[in-house]
Amino acid sequence: MSIIKNSVWNLFGYAIPTLIAIPSLGFLARGLGPEGFGVYTIAIALVGYAGIFDVGLTRSVIREIAIHRDNHHERTKVISTSTSFLVLFSCFGAFLLLIFSDGIVNYLKISGVEHSDIQLAFKLLAICIPLFILNQLWSAILEGDEKFGIVNIQKSISSSCIAGIPAIFVFYSATLSAAVAGLIFARVISILVSAYYVRNDIKISGVHFCYKTFKRLFFFGGWMTVSNIISPVMVYFDRFIVSNIMGADKVAFYSAPAEVILKLGIIPAAIGRAVFPRLSNIKDFKEFKRNVNKSLLLMFLICLPVIIIGLLYSGLVLKIWFGENYQINSFNILNVLLIGFFFNALAMIPFSAIQALGKSKITALIHCAELVPYLALLYFMVEKYGLLGAAISWSIRVILDALLLQWLYTRMCSVYEN
């Protein structure tokens, strides 16, 4: 299958969940109130940040399955080793969240929402971590095989549940713990769907741990772990800093436009997910470069109209989706984030290309170099300019990140061609 066909499959996988997420998030924003909704988006961010407990193995598995697609023996070792390790390590991550949940709640400076409800919600959230990690791993097997039709049926079902079920729970009980309970229920459905589609792989591979295979996975994935630790900090930590400096009641007015950007992110993510396994499986560098250029052009042509429409109608989108308060307080934030989003989308192509060449160390070191300056800028800008400062900081970082990745990829091309 071509990158374009696989990208279309990926977009299809996001279409139904997005249609469900639009009214669902709007209902959650109104049902939980600004502070409750803001804390809920932070809870979602924590689950995303729990991706560090896959130590980069899911990305490694995609690459290894793509490389060893016709090697049955190596394939089973990759699946059994990664599954065995991640079951144990994700449970360890859940245990850590359980221990530190009260400290996280205190850091957020919550005023208007009942503390006991939030503490319960964050303890319940720990259950999501192993479910999230294993679901990512089993989806990675299908992505490595480029079975994007199956991947996106699975993602469509799973993401629809994750988008809609928390809102159903909040309809019956407008509390944060009810929303998180709905999220757990959705994650259980999600992992059952994933397990069904890879049941033969799981059954054949069994539960065995091969140190040599793990070492190879970790050598590539180890640098991915560095990226996985740092990248979510740069993606989600703005919400934590806003909550700590300005109070949890202000987070929602930043989180709402950030959620719009997150939903728009399905477009570049669909292309990026198709690009990585395809590039990993290409042996001829000229073909590799041709596919990268085609992917970059595709990303540009698809995302540019989205950004233009978004900039023209940002206020209207926020009013319809979240309510008039969000239109008043958040439309400038959304406009700034949209500009950053465009560059962030383009950056996915050189990022995937560099990693497909086995150079995950380079992308990890870039993230390391960006972290401290970004957090310093973010803290200063939030103190000085509030929510808009957070949006400007994020956009500056992703623009510089995109330019740096493209420059490094171009340099690598000159080395490989010579």
From Swiss-Prot:
The chain crosses the membrane at residues 8-28, 37-57, 85-105, 124-144, 165-185, 217-237, 251-271, 297-317, 334-354, 362-382, 385-405. Its main location: membrane. The keyword Transmembrane helix applies. GO terms for cellular component: plasma membrane. CDD domains: MATE_Wzx_like (cd13128). GO terms for biological process: lipopolysaccharide biosynthetic process. Pathway: Bacterial outer membrane biogenesis; lipopolysaccharide biosynthesis. It is a multi-pass membrane protein. Keywords: Cell inner membrane, Cell membrane, Lipopolysaccharide biosynthesis, Membrane, Transmembrane, Transmembrane helix. InterPro entries: Poly_Biosynth_Transport, Polysacc_synth. Pfam families: Polysacc_synt (PF01943). Could be an O-antigen transporter. Belongs to the polysaccharide synthase family. This is Putative O-antigen transporter.
